[in-house]
Amino acid sequence: MLNTLPDLHRSFAEQLKLKLQSDSRIHSLLAGGSFIHGGFDQYSDLDFVVVIDPLYYDEIMAQRMAFAGTLGHLLHAFTGEHVGEPRLLICLFGPELLHVDLKFITLDMLTQRVEEPAVLFTRDNDALKRQLAKFCAHWPNM
């Protein structure tokens, strides 16, 4: 799945996956956007959903800027309140520019989604499948 990405994107995604797999507080890593819809090129951003164990959600949300800084040379990051999504961290990495969106949620929060994500890793595939099956993705009415 990751092998179809441009080198910069693939390298970042692989590094993120390894980092999150080694963190027992993380339940799953999901991908969305052009990663699943197609049309991905060297100018595309990466859209990730980081599913967190609810026991650690507040802790990780409080540390998400610092966490993003461990993923590479973070040029700038800001939260997504301006797009109505405060759980979103919008990141720009460099020196070769890479836009990465990290959305931090718990498994229960997967009920509200705009697309069916790709699963990059999960600690409990059955629980993830059950949660995804409860609700279908839909765009909000604007």
Where are these regions (language model features)?
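Helical scaffold of the NTase/Pol beta-like nucleotidyltransferase catalytic core
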Residues: M1-L29
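Conserved NTP/Mg2+-binding pocket subregion across the NTase superfamily
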Residues: M1-L5, A68-M142
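Short secondary-structure capping/turn segments at boundaries of alpha-helices and beta-strands
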Residues: Q15-L18, G32-G38, L74-F78, P86-I90
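Hydrophobic, Leu/Ile/Phe/Ala-enriched alpha-helical segments that form helix-helix packing faces
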Residues: L16, L20, R25, R64-L71, ...
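A generic structural signal for short, solvent-exposed coil/turn residues
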Residues: Q21-D23, F40, V83, G94
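Ordered hydrophobic segments in well-structured contexts
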Residues: S28, V49-V51, L89-C91
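Catalytic metal-binding acidic patch
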Residues: G33-Q63
